[in-house]
Each structure stands twice: as structure tokens, then as C-alpha cells.
């Protein structure tokens, strides 16, 4: 089945208010015999160099950031490990698990869903015989699962989850599910392949613009158009916070150093017992507390004499490079 579309879509966003909007054109769209959906898009005109920037960003997001649906674990009646066989079933358990892994599903349910299958031979079991929740749709209903002989029964239950990218079996997570569920590697990626090329675009008599050609292959759970739209929204959401970003100015190194010094307890000044006790009785516990005072103020502390004041001033200067004013400000 082959479709070619020439519809133009305006992709100028609110974020790009100062730049002229560019256009995207669906050059080709069709479904291949193996169920893969193909779409070819042209984006432009873009400023010189932006074709690679946009193409690379879209390709990365399309391949790794779009959510998809896949079978994550399977429980088969009478089976305790993946190296077993089911009586009357041509495929061994490993083959059945592989066939379940290749199911193409679509679901918007955020939580794990459970599907079931009860089939009796003889005959072929395909995906259309699966009992699925209303939120889940099978995209490849003719997909082969198993072949049953006369009188054979295949009964199984399977978990359906949503995710991104590829998720390998995590045996450390096996405690969260029943012991007879067999985990399988899950491929959530709805996009199977992305290619892009950049060519010169003519605007008037000039060829100083880029035209981005983007090819997208999906498994059918999303159309290439839907995948491109989702990828664009992800990128907009990723960059939009940077439009009004505000950075806290880090403190000047000297200021940070002074703040650190101010938090030093007066014990670090190694004062005489007399001077130390007088300061503590006056509720002076840190250097910050001490810097509030002048030399004149210190002399007003009970039992704090000129010698003790000079000792404090000298300790601050020698150990921390700090000084106290001699007198109160006249203002």
C-alpha cells in the first residue's frame, strides 16, 4: 500500500518569534509488507548549518526518547523456566517468549496491564487470539506465537508495560512479580530506523539555505507523522525552560572565604582562659559574633581588660587576617 502526500504544515512555533517559520512536507508515506510504516519528510528552508542541528536532534529523540509498549514477562501454565517445553506445542518456551517479544502493541495506560491466552489445538496461534485489556491494541494480529498439535493446550498470562528504548531482563527485580513469571528483554522503541540528509535549498536566486530530508521507519504502533510530532514536542519541552533562565551569581571568592572564616568558633583563636571565659559569658561564640565588637566594646565586657583586648586583636590578625575597629563609628 503506497501513499504520497504533498500537504504542507507550518512548523513556526511561538518560541521562534524572531525567525521566519519553515515548512515540513510529507514527501512519501506507505506501509511495507512486513508491517513497517515508512514516512519521508522535507523540512525547510533552514538557515545554513541548521539542517544538521535539527536532523541530528530529531534522530536521537526519535530513536531513544519516544515511549512504546511491549510485553515484559510471561507466565505459561506448567512451565517454571525458559528451557522447558510445552506438551503438544511445536515451539519450545524460548521460541514462544521470542514471539511474544516481537508483538507490536499500542497502549496509553500508564500502569502495567495483563493479557491472557487460552488456546487448544490443533492449529496455529496468532496474536489475534490474545485476550487484551481494553486499553491495549495489537498492531500485528497475524503475528505467529505457537503451533499446537491435536489436544494440546497453551495457557499463558503476560504483563504489558510502557517504557523507552531497550530494557534488558533485570533478575534483581524478580521479587516484585510471581516466581513463575519469565521476564523477557523488552523493546519499547516504536521507531525502528531514522535517516536524514541535508541538501541546499533555493530561496529566490540564493542557495544559502538548508533543506532537511528525514526518513522514519516505525513498527506501526505510531505512524511516522505521529513519531515526528512527538519528537518535536519533546525537544520543545527540553529547550523552552532555557528561554527565561536565570542564574544565581556565585559569591565572590573573597566573600565566600570571609563567610567561612566568620563561622569559626572562638576556640580556634586559642585565647587565654581568662579572655576565652569572658567572651563566652558575653555570648560571643564565633568569629562572626566577635566581629560585631570594636576594641572599645570589648573593654566594656565584665573583667575584660586592655591586655585581653590586645590578645583578641592579635589572634584575629595572626590567625585569620581579620581586624577589629578601635572605636565605635562617630555617625
UniProtKB/Swiss-Prot annotation:
Disulphide-bridged cysteine pairs: none
Under catalytic activity, the entry for this protein gives:
RNA(n) + a ribonucleoside 5'-triphosphate = RNA(n+1) + diphosphate
Q: Where is this region: Alpha C-terminal domain (alpha-CTD)?
A: 256-331
Q: Which Pfam families match?
A: RNA_pol_A_bac (PF01000), RNA_pol_A_CTD (PF03118), RNA_pol_L (PF01193)
Record GO biological process: DNA-templated transcription
Q: Which GO terms describe its molecular function?
A: DNA binding; DNA-directed RNA polymerase activity; protein dimerization activity
Instruction: For this UniProt record, give its keywords in alphabetical order, as a comma-separated list.
Output: DNA-directed RNA polymerase, Nucleotidyltransferase, Transcription, Transferase
Say if the entry is tagged with keyword Transcription.
yes
Annotated coiled-coil segments of the chain: none
- Where does the source fall among the domains of life? Bacteria
Q: Where is this region: Alpha N-terminal domain (alpha-NTD)?
A: 1-246
The entry's cellular-component GO terms read:
cytoplasm; DNA-directed RNA polymerase complex
Q: Does the keyword Cytoplasm apply?
A: no
Query: Which Enzyme Commission number(s) are listed?
Result: 2.7.7.6
- What is the stated purpose of this protein? DNA-dependent RNA polymerase catalyzes the transcription of DNA into RNA using the four ribonucleoside triphosphates as substrates.
**NCBIfam families hit by this protein:** PRK05182.1-2, PRK05182.2-2, PRK05182.2-5, rpoA
Domain remarks in the entry?
The N-terminal domain is essential for RNAP assembly and basal transcription, whereas the C-terminal domain is involved in interaction with transcriptional regulators and with upstream promoter elements.
Checking HAMAP family in the record gives: RNApol_bact_RpoA
Q: How does it assemble?
A: In cyanobacteria the RNAP catalytic core is composed of 2 alpha, 1 beta, 1 beta', 1 gamma and 1 omega subunit. When a sigma factor is associated with the core the holoenzyme is formed, which can initiate transcription.
Family designation: Belongs to the RNA polymerase alpha chain family.
The protein here is known as DNA-directed RNA polymerase subunit alpha
The source organism is Synechococcus sp. (strain JA-3-3Ab) (Cyanobacteria bacterium Yellowstone A-Prime)
Which gene produces this protein?
rpoA
